[in-house]
Amino acid sequence: MSTTADKIAVLGAGSWGTALASLLARHGHPTVLWGRDAAMVEAIDQRHENPRYLPGIPLPDSLRATTDLASAVEGAAWILVVTPSHAFGETVRALAPLRPAGAGVAWATKGFEPGSGRFLHEVAREVLGEDVPLAVVTGPSFAKEVTQGLPTAITVHGDVPEFAQTVAEAMHGPAFRAYTGDDMVGAELGGAMKNVLAVATGVADGMQLGLNARAGLITRGLNEMLRLAAAIGAKPETLMGLAGLGDLVLTCTGDLSRNRRLGLALGRGQTLQDAVREIGQVVESVQTADEVMRQARRHGIDLPISDRVRAVLHGEQTPEEGLRALLAREQKPEYPDTLFK
């Protein structure tokens, strides 16, 4: 297949996929957004609005949308996957035989592969082969604010520096700063764990435990990120940057976060089912909490906050019981001596 100058295919027409497709189109790149919902795709393509996920926010006239995956990726210079983590593997497998020769694949999906707990770059590499450039787009970014043109900073980590740079340059603009790195493991870990930790801070705020508790949970949550990162060979500086600390702070404090809103609802006494129904979109933490703890057990790392979130989400503990379990833990040094060595 031929490759059109810099056509970009974005797979996934949810809020984040639509926001990134809109950003790329506004930056002058021929951009096609693929989605499964025919009515929503038609609204994006013809009326330039995503009425379900980003109602009332105009999208660029140049942004095209389709339900035909082959048409979406044909001639693309590179492809950006922005689906929920549970649909990531399925989407990449459908993409594999259609991908134009030489087209790299990036994703802005956050989470692990359900069931196996594998990192998404491991899934992509297995499906796409060894020669396809890969990159992950992550960092503190709410879709609504990006489509409104509010200042945002993200980071792109890839296994081929030139491809990560290509993705970053396409996204970089007056109100959108895109940095680059080469630590895909750390970038993916931060993007997944922050969703689980946002539930914890949401629960605390829902229970009206105060700002001290919120700050403590965010900081000790970062500690959990750093310890698991060290165990799996990620770079600590990745977790101290946009992919870790930045995304953690945003998701734990901003009410646009679905995971924080889930925690708020649980802290106020709602059931998980009612809270998820009320939010009306995929809440990644419900699944990711299991996969985070699978990684922790695999590497022998104690993650008390993440584990309490998992227990609450599974109905094994109430939020009050989870809080008591955390507060009953023994006194210890703030950081292990070996963490930054």
From Swiss-Prot:
<protein>
    <recommendedName>
        <fullName>Glycerol-3-phosphate dehydrogenase [NAD(P)+]</fullName>
        <ecNumber>1.1.1.94</ecNumber>
    </recommendedName>
</protein>
<keyword id="KW-0520">NAD</keyword>
<feature type="binding site">
    <location>
        <position position="15"/>
    </location>
    <ligand>
        <name>NADPH</name>
    </ligand>
</feature>
<feature type="binding site">
    <location>
        <position position="110"/>
    </location>
    <ligand>
        <name>sn-glycerol 3-phosphate</name>
    </ligand>
</feature>
<dbReference type="GO" id="GO:0005975">
    <property type="term" value="P:carbohydrate metabolic process"/>
</dbReference>
<feature type="binding site">
    <location>
        <position position="258"/>
    </location>
    <ligand>
        <name>sn-glycerol 3-phosphate</name>
    </ligand>
</feature>
<keyword id="KW-0444">Lipid biosynthesis</keyword>
<feature type="binding site">
    <location>
        <position position="36"/>
    </location>
    <ligand>
        <name>NADPH</name>
    </ligand>
</feature>
<dbReference type="GO" id="GO:0051287">
    <property type="term" value="F:NAD binding"/>
</dbReference>
<dbReference type="Pfam" id="PF01210">
    <property type="entry name" value="NAD_Gly3P_dh_N"/>
</dbReference>
<feature type="binding site">
    <location>
        <position position="139"/>
    </location>
    <ligand>
        <name>sn-glycerol 3-phosphate</name>
    </ligand>
</feature>
<dbReference type="Pfam" id="PF07479">
    <property type="entry name" value="NAD_Gly3P_dh_C"/>
</dbReference>
<dbReference type="InterPro" id="IPR013328">
    <property type="entry name" value="6PGD_dom2"/>
</dbReference>
<keyword id="KW-0547">Nucleotide-binding</keyword>
<comment type="pathway">
    <text>Membrane lipid metabolism; glycerophospholipid metabolism.</text>
</comment>
<comment type="function">
    <text>Catalyzes the reduction of the glycolytic intermediate dihydroxyacetone phosphate (DHAP) to sn-glycerol 3-phosphate (G3P), the key precursor for phospholipid synthesis.</text>
</comment>
<feature type="binding site">
    <location>
        <position position="247"/>
    </location>
    <ligand>
        <name>sn-glycerol 3-phosphate</name>
    </ligand>
</feature>
<dbReference type="InterPro" id="IPR008927">
    <property type="entry name" value="6-PGluconate_DH-like_C_sf"/>
</dbReference>
<feature type="binding site">
    <location>
        <position position="259"/>
    </location>
    <ligand>
        <name>sn-glycerol 3-phosphate</name>
    </ligand>
</feature>
<comment type="similarity">
    <text>Belongs to the NAD-dependent glycerol-3-phosphate dehydrogenase family.</text>
</comment>
<feature type="active site" description="Proton acceptor">
    <location>
        <position position="194"/>
    </location>
</feature>
<keyword id="KW-0963">Cytoplasm</keyword>
<keyword id="KW-0521">NADP</keyword>
<feature type="binding site">
    <location>
        <position position="194"/>
    </location>
    <ligand>
        <name>sn-glycerol 3-phosphate</name>
    </ligand>
</feature>
<keyword id="KW-0594">Phospholipid biosynthesis</keyword>
<feature type="binding site">
    <location>
        <position position="258"/>
    </location>
    <ligand>
        <name>NADPH</name>
    </ligand>
</feature>
<dbReference type="GO" id="GO:0046167">
    <property type="term" value="P:glycerol-3-phosphate biosynthetic process"/>
</dbReference>
<feature type="binding site">
    <location>
        <position position="110"/>
    </location>
    <ligand>
        <name>NADPH</name>
    </ligand>
</feature>
<keyword id="KW-0560">Oxidoreductase</keyword>
<feature type="binding site">
    <location>
        <position position="141"/>
    </location>
    <ligand>
        <name>sn-glycerol 3-phosphate</name>
    </ligand>
</feature>
<feature type="binding site">
    <location>
        <position position="282"/>
    </location>
    <ligand>
        <name>NADPH</name>
    </ligand>
</feature>
<dbReference type="GO" id="GO:0005829">
    <property type="term" value="C:cytosol"/>
</dbReference>
<dbReference type="InterPro" id="IPR006109">
    <property type="entry name" value="G3P_DH_NAD-dep_C"/>
</dbReference>
<dbReference type="InterPro" id="IPR011128">
    <property type="entry name" value="G3P_DH_NAD-dep_N"/>
</dbReference>
<feature type="binding site">
    <location>
        <position position="143"/>
    </location>
    <ligand>
        <name>NADPH</name>
    </ligand>
</feature>
<dbReference type="InterPro" id="IPR006168">
    <property type="entry name" value="G3P_DH_NAD-dep"/>
</dbReference>
<dbReference type="InterPro" id="IPR036291">
    <property type="entry name" value="NAD(P)-bd_dom_sf"/>
</dbReference>
<keyword id="KW-0443">Lipid metabolism</keyword>
<feature type="binding site">
    <location>
        <position position="16"/>
    </location>
    <ligand>
        <name>NADPH</name>
    </ligand>
</feature>
<dbReference type="GO" id="GO:0046474">
    <property type="term" value="P:glycerophospholipid biosynthetic process"/>
</dbReference>
<feature type="binding site">
    <location>
        <position position="257"/>
    </location>
    <ligand>
        <name>sn-glycerol 3-phosphate</name>
    </ligand>
</feature>
<dbReference type="GO" id="GO:0047952">
    <property type="term" value="F:glycerol-3-phosphate dehydrogenase [NAD(P)+] activity"/>
</dbReference>
